[in-house]
């Protein structure tokens, strides 16, 4: 089972010297009950955003442009593919920068949550600010981007995802009605008033976060700027059960190789004949395997065969087309996968600036949100992952395949990257890297004979079933044909 949750925050604050002397009450501020949606009722989450007013002179009053009627239509297959490709490119851009600056051994973040936040902001962005947002998201869908992303998310993993959103506003803050309407329609974010009492507001916000993440994130905010005028919150909760569960009785302590010299002990989930589809990339040589969940999702492992790698190198040439392999068949495989418990929190201001969004934190044009001059002052993100044995028994057809002899092995006992992908579109929901799944343990020097040589996770190429080749023209090692499987003998 994989249990994931994510929260993103943008905050709008108002500089007291530039704000209107007195905001008049806004009647649209109504308390919003917790919205946790699953199945067809689920809605999108906007990340928690913190924005504040800067010292620019107010510009002309520009209402947010209403999206064309075409935006309200269901996305075409081609639009869905283009959006999924764009999201994968954004994901690799974002995670490469985060990995470069992080000193933590394990990372996890939700590019979907970040993209939802930026597309939410795009509802009120104008001119160059809007253009930069679309460029960073690699979006070519024009004004329909928030609508397409919203519709795509509503169709994700029925029963596995719960999405929640909330918006907090300072009483009387002059926000555009169109922005409020579209925020609720596309992201499920209704406005709720801040009381003006910091302690009470913090308690209310953190209580909502705790409920939306089922108690996994507590005390997300420790302070609230005195001049806060707007908070946009979203929470993503994903619970994925393995389509073929791991037997807890087979889980045992194993060695995870940190590098050529040291290992740490870790609980390894195991299966002798696990239905897996995998392939091998070269230059650099990377083993890729899709572990299927129910609800059309997969945990995708990318494991370089050498220790000397960084995320930027691995992701440099990784595209949507490489990971999207719907034609690959599953094969029974000997599998070892470490149990994981990851949590990571970071401020994304520097990373988003490096991606080209410096203007958001200096002088953005957000007059589609309010005629007041706003600037993004903080973007906080937190994600976590728990990986364990629980799953749902495979269907009869899969059980038959699993009864055949395993022809290969996929042993995840060295540093790796991972994605949580939606299978039909390969839309990335979460991305992360694991260099040490047990950072609290004392590394142990390993014996020479225990050192993996970079090939152990697959059988040596000489041992591949007949008909298989180490590399085919598109640099992928596909599963063998049906005739390569050992067939059970007929009972006499």
From Swiss-Prot:
The record marks 404-405 as: Reactive bond for plasmin. GO terms for molecular function: serine-type endopeptidase inhibitor activity. The record marks 405-406 as: Reactive bond for chymotrypsin. Residues 23-40 form a propeptide. Residues 443-475 have a biased composition (Basic and acidic residues). It holds the Pfam family Serpin. Expressed by the liver and secreted in plasma. The record marks 40-41 as: Cleavage. InterPro entries: Alpha2AP_serpin_dom, Serpin_CS, Serpin_dom, Serpin_fam, Serpin_sf, Serpin_sf_1, Serpin_sf_2. The keyword Lipoprotein does not apply. Coiled coil: none annotated. Belongs to the serpin family. Forms protease inhibiting heterodimer with TMPRSS7. Serine protease inhibitor. The major targets of this inhibitor are plasmin and trypsin, but it also inactivates matriptase-3/TMPRSS7 and chymotrypsin. This is Alpha-2-antiplasmin. It comes from Bos taurus. The lineage of its organism: Eukaryota, Metazoa, Chordata, Craniata, Vertebrata. The gene is SERPINF2.
């Amino acid at each position: 089972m994989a249990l994931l949750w994510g929260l993103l925050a943008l905050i709008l604050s108002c500089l007291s010297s530039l704000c209107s002397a007195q905001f008049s009450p806004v009647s649209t501020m109504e308390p919003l009950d917790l919205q946790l949606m699953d199945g067809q009722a689920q809605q999108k989450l906007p990340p928690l955003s913190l924005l504040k007013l800067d010292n620019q002179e107010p510009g002309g009053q520009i209402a947010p442009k209403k999206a064309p009627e075409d935006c309200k239509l269901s996305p075409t297959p081609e639009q869905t593919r283009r959006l999924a490709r764009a999201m994968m490119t954004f994901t690799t851009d974002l995670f490469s920068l985060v990995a470069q600056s992080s000193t933590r051994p394990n990372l996890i973040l939700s590019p979907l949550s970040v993209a939802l936040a930026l597309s939410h902001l795009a509802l009120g962005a104008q001119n160059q600010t809007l253009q930069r947002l679309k460029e960073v998201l690699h979006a070519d869908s024009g004004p329909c981007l928030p609508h397409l992303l919203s519709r795509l998310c509503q169709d994700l993993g029925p029963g596995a995802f719960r999405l929640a959103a909330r918006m907090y506003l300072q009483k009387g803050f002059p926000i555009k009605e169109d922005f409020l309407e579209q925020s609720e329609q596309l992201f499920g974010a209704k406005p709720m008033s801040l009381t003006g009492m910091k302690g009470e507001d913090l308690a209310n916000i953190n209580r909502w976060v705790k409920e939306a993440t089922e108690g996994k994130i507590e005390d997300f905010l420790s302070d609230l700027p005195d001049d806060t005028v707007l908070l946009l919150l979203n929470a993503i909760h994903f619970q994925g059960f393995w389509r073929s569960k791991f037997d807890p009785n087979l889980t045992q302590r194993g060695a995870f190789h940190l590098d050529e010299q040291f290992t740490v002990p870790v609980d390894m989930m195991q299966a002798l004949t696990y239905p897996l589809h995998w392939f091998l990339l070269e230059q650099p040589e990377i083993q890729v395997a899709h572990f299927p969940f129910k609800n059309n999702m997969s945990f995708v492992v990318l494991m370089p065969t050498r220790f000397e790698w960084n995320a930027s190198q691995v992701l440099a040439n990784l595209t949507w087309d490489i990971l999207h392999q719907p034609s690959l068949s599953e094969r029974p495989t000997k599998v070892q996968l470490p149990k994981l418990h990851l949590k990571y929190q970071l401020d994304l201001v520097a990373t988003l600036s490096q991606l080209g969004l410096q203007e958001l934190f200096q002088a953005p044009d957000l007059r589609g949100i309010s005629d007041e001059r706003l600037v993004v002052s903080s973007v906080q993100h937190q994600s976590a992952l728990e990986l364990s044995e629980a799953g749902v028994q495979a269907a009869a057809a899969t059980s038959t395949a699993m009864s055949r002899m395993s022809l290969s092995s996929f042993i995840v006992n060295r540093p790796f990257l991972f994605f949580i992908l939606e299978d039909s579109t390969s839309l990335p929901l979460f991305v992360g890297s694991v260099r040490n799944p047990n950072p609290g343990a004392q590394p142990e020097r390993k014996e020479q004979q225990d050192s993996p040589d970079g090939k152990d996770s697959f059988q040596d190429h000489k041992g591949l079933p007949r008909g298989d080749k180490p590399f085919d023209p598109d640099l992928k090692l596909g599963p063998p044909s049906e005739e390569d499987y050992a067939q059970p003998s007929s009972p006499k």
